[in-house]
Amino acid sequence: MYMAAPPGVPRWAKTVNGERAALHCLGSIYGLKQSSALLNKRLTAVLKSMGFQPLISDPSVYTKGPPGPDQQLVACWVDDILFLNRRDDKQGRFDFNAQLESHFVMSEWTEGEADFILNIRIDRDWKAGTIKISQPAAVEKLARKFGLDDIKATGAPVIPMKPDLRLAKAVGDEIVPREEFDYPRIVGSLLYLSLTTRPDISTATGILSRFMACPGRAHCEAARQVVSYLVGTKSMGLVYRRTGSSIPVAYGHARTNNFAREGDAQDSTFITYADADLANDLSTRRSVSGYCIVLHGGLIAWQSKLQTTVSLSTAEAETLAATDACKQIIHFRLFLRELGRKQQGPNILFEDNMAAIALVKNPEASRASRHYQLKLHFLKNLQERNIFEYRHCTTDLQLADSMTKPTPRDLFSKYRAWMGIA
């Protein structure tokens, strides 16, 4: 790794022709893109020497020992490390920290239960068997950072975006300058929250992110509404339930409405919802894909994404959404299997479009579907291998509908509860 010589270097640090020399770095420098890779390489070597092995599905997660109560886990995010072991094994935690301290300069560590990591607050209720992750401090910081701390929680909107809102690109003098309202940075901060603990704002932030270079007054007001909504609900977060403590809300409504079957695993097997909104974007007529994956009563993965191609039918748009969901299903099955929690049988994928389900069962190259045959055969192959099972649900019970478009208040509140947000 080389760097340009900074001002003030001795005269000898120059080339023959008088140009300033490049310096060869003997170690990584904090802030460079190579630094985190070098740290990860070193950390992996140290953890392997301690008996840990990285997962194939996620190399930032390490395991030691066979699956069970005595298994130890390490999760890393650059230089932030989370160590998990049996609750009563206090000595194991001290030994782990001591071994790391023999290789690295460590900041003060917290012995016991983690209650805060990567700006995420962790709350446990051992009696109720729940664990909650939320980011109230991040919401407050967002409002304060962008001068929106005048927003009051008492008057906050109950939905992040109006369902009838239609936004178009601003042009010319309609574009609001960043000096007046730093739209890109605000939306970027909202996207971070939507990807960590607040899936209920994913659709709204996805729509706002389409106008990073051309926001108008309406876009700025819409962004302000999302921030206002977060301020009013800053204590909310994703709640997960201990196995056997209760039927997850999202699965309970499926059982009640008879498209979840008796005998289906309820706690240890995740279920997936996939949906699409045809021609959602007014300027490009591209559709929006959405999926939600629920485990232990709360979302573990979700997506609200503008499709890269223009779908010519609802069935095509839904197939593209299901393809994205199934790629995530494959990853989670491998991840859980490596942790010794292999999924039993296929994972259920709820879909509200009968045509999309029928096409996967019989992917004939018709004039209407031959241009996306690859995706249809991909889904068919996964069904035949017992990776997932397509199952129909009615539209009013389609949780992923919340990821495709803004919804009215009552519907939004229902979906938010099904996500496990409380």
Question: Each predicted region: which residue ranges?
Answer:
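Long, low-complexity, charge-biased intrinsically disordered regions
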Residues: 1-422
